[in-house]
Amino acid sequence: DMARIYSDGSFMILGRKDNVINSGGIKIQAEEMEKRLQSLIDVPFVITSVPDRRLGQAVTLLIEGRLHLTAIEGRIQAVLEPYYRPKYIRMVNHIPRTENGKINRAECRILAQNLHLGGKEE
């Protein structure tokens, strides 16, 4: 796990190290971005990445269901700095989960890559 330690001795858990997206040299913690977007998106969603020639990894937002994309993009622009904003937003039928109901990040990454390459959601 990764944490931010403050000068007063308190700390905040940011998420798992393996969920860090390196996009153009900027380290983006997927769970931290999800927390920032939680109040804006009222359906299940996940931040993941796809390979990108220029950036290394491109931040990708998978959203369960069908929402108005323009409205979502406007909300995201209002709360996230440009370098944190998802480069791609994809609507999916469902967010892959483990047997315990947690987000299956490995499957989400594969799904995002398949959709990015023009494949279909399975």
Feature-to-residue mapping (PLM):
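AMP-binding/adenylate-forming catalytic core of the ANL superfamily
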Residues: 2-84, 94, 107-110
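Compositionally biased, intrinsically disordered low-complexity regions enriched in proline and serine
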Residues: 84-85, 117
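Short, conserved catalytic or interaction motifs in soluble domains
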Residues: 97
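Acidic/polar alpha-helix N-cap and adjacent early helical turns
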Residues: 111-122
